[in-house]
Amino acid sequence: MQTKPYPVSIRSECFLPFGAGWVCPAPEEIRTLMQIAELTGSKAATLTGLKDSRTVRRWIGGDTPIPFSAWAILVEYAGLGKIWKV
């Protein structure tokens, strides 16, 4: 259940379940979500089970796409709902 409205600066397709048309967020959208959630790269790494923030830097730098599972964790942490639920 979504508790906050989705930010207009992030495409609505980024909040769909994986099998229902999810679109991988752009680096700027990842940065926006992290700002909303008040997450540092280190905290985002810890939440998503990463060893360090290097991979998070790759996501927000556009070098590596963020996996749906990691994005879903960050979305829920930001209070925007459980997008993984079908």
Give the label of every model feature segment:
Residues 27-43:
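Short basic helix-loop element that most often maps to the first helix and adjoining turn
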Residues 1-23:
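N-terminal flexible/basic segments that precede or flank functional cores
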Residues 30-31, 48, 75-79:
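Secretory-pathway ectodomains
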Residues 42, 48-65:
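Recognition helix of helix-turn-helix/homeodomain-like DNA-binding domains
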Residues 22-26, 63:
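Residue-level marker of regulatory loop/turn positions in helix-turn-helix DNA-binding domains and
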Residues 25-28, 51:
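Alpha-helix N-cap/N′ positions at the starts of helices
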Residues 64-86:
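DNA major-groove recognition helix of helix-turn-helix/homeodomain DNA-binding modules
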